[in-house]
Amino acid sequence: MVRVVCERVSEASGIEFPPELTEFRAAPNPRGGVTLRGKVGYRGPLQPPTLPKIQFDLTTDEVIIRPPVLRPIYHSYSDRPAQPARIHCYPIDEVLAEKTRAMGERGRPRDLYDIIRLSRSGRQVLQLDAAAEREILERKCAHRGLPIPTLAALEASPNWVELESEWANMLGHQLPALPPLDTYRADLAVYFDWLSGAPVADLPAITEAEASDPAWQPPAAVALPSEWGVAAPLEGIRFAGANRLLLELDYRPQKGQPGVRLVEPYSFRYSRKGYLLFYGRNIERQRITAYRADRIMGVKVTTQPFRPIWRVEL
């Protein structure tokens, strides 16, 4: 079955899948079920000395609480198909529960990182329900015979010491800029407060500099040519906002002094005049500012965190 799929992909893309680099093995899990683990190596256009491999973990021993959602496979390149391929995925609330359970089991840096990224968006943008989220988590943990993770239990675990020492080693090479662990530890406490039903303050939305189109919704990815013919680096802005990191924004206003501003990123809005606007708090001026996206020349994500005073919508 796997080799048939590899042959079809190879015919459509030209990517080679050497048969000797395809390997699957069955392994028992702690509950007496079977997990199928495998790797599929491939040779693409870059021709690295060591061929990369795709890793698979397949199991029937898992409880699915929410109905899967059909989502398009993200493809940011120019050769993306007109009709993107779609696959069934966990909804966000179930992914968050999976990550929280994993945090209790192994406590790896990527688990903490994903919990905070998902919970920030889940609470503030997607409006996830805390009681429903806790119910999903309880059922996930019960399936594996695990206690519900708590902040105290996580910090008392030997895994936490390893997480602290491996934060930079395991995440630094995967991210444009590495957020400080302290900010994620602080937000983990907020997440568990929310999960327990405690009230968590909701920050106000930014004050707009000009009226925006209320019907506009930001796309999954933003690509926009600037007035100078180069792509405005808007995904860097999104990354900084989602990770609560300051930006060095190289901006060329229609009037005023061009140059680099240190900015807290908050939101994209689409003005009634037809401009995509980035709203950020200018640190030097201590005020929210609307920046036209097509006038942004460059973005550098710093490792300096900020504590939002408005709702981050990125």
Regions found by a protein language model. Give the residues of each.
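Core beta-strand-centered patch of the WYL/Sm-like small regulatory domain
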Residues: 49-83, 215-314
